[in-house]
Amino acid sequence: DLNGITEKLNYIKDMGFTAIWLNPFYESSYRDGGYDVTDFYKVGKRYGTNADFKRLCTIAHQKGIKICVDLVAGHTSLECEWFKKSCCTEKNEYTNRYVWTDNWLNIYNGECIGGYAQRNGAYMKNFFYCQPALNYGFANIDEPSWQLPPEHPDRRETKRELINIMEYWITLGADGFRVDLAASLIKNDYDGRAIIKFWREIRTIFDEKYPECVLISEWSHPSQAIAAGFHIDFLIHAVFPAYTSLFRAEDERDVPRIFFGNSFFDTRGNGNIETFLNDYLDEYEKTKDRGFISIPTGNHDLARISYGRTNTELEVIFAFIMTMPGIPFVYYGDEIGMEYIPDMPSKEGGFTRTGSRTPMQ
């Protein structure tokens, strides 16, 4: 819980870390590890209270440690009051807060779920069925009867609410945000121009009001993310094979099973550095002196970096991560070689990811 983190701040400080990214701690239905939020303005009871968060920030700042909040910008829980009101047949302020088609049978290429509410429409999901997509608009409209442009007043209101959430946690002491699925908010945005404009506008606001606030993206395309105003982007598995080619290309290590091959940091010597360099060097040159690329040890979605590795391999991997240009992120427990536990029963939507989400070993 939050008070437990506060108690361990000296441990984090003694290792030399200067910031903490917290996974979602909001009130949630916990069908996807807290990434299905029911109340963006309230700490979940299992983690403490808003006052506990404020205390954590205060004490962390005294120790020279910044606190970054996980901003789940693209969706909520089905149990969120916003979504419950959006399900109503009567028009209200939340009618267009989420993406709905114009007919319960129109599931839009399988991206939407019909038959859930009395409302005659199908809601768009972002990942699991329990994560209805907030409506930030469509950059390219192919069904004008229900798709709205990003400039529509209702879309601007959704964006205004997102900014309100960010400002609320800043007032309690937050120093920045890691934005979940940052590139996916505006739909049918094939070249990324609309979402870049969206985040650039937010960055402009925050530069004026909160110039020390850091914005970190789960975009996986640093040149686009930094052009959008983010300070840091993770070069991970979502767009390029570069990250996976370093550590997790083998079938048994790549738990999401997106890319296949051989890792460079594998003592069997079957991998190569070219796959990584082809992507990394291009992104590095495009972002140099404008923002930072992060090569993390892992996160809540990946098998732990220690999985199937020797301590010698891990020492070399950490030396690489800690000396590369950019901002290193260390997933909790990786600093002690914490192990991934395969075939664990799924917990709160973790599935194969559950083995990376265990308590400190």
Q: Where in this protein do the model-derived segments appear?
A:
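Acidic/aromatic-lined carbohydrate-recognition and catalytic surfaces
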Residues: 1-160, 171, 182-229, 238, ...
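Short hydrophobic/charged patches on amphipathic alpha-helices used for structural packing
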Residues: 6-9, 166, 318
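Alpha-helix termination/capping residues and helix-transition junctions
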Residues: 14, 171-173, 287, 323-324
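Residue-level detector of family-conserved "landmark" positions at structurally sensitive sites
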Residues: 22, 70-71, 179, 331-332, ...
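Residue-level marker of motif borders
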Residues: 65, 121-123, 175, 294-296, ...
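Conserved alpha/beta catalytic core and glycan-binding cleft of carbohydrate-active enzymes
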Residues: 78-110, 199, 203-359
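A Trp-anchored, charged/polar loop motif used as the substrate-binding/catalytic surface
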Residues: 154-165, 169, 270-281
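Active-site groove signature of glycoside hydrolases
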Residues: 163-188, 290, 294-302
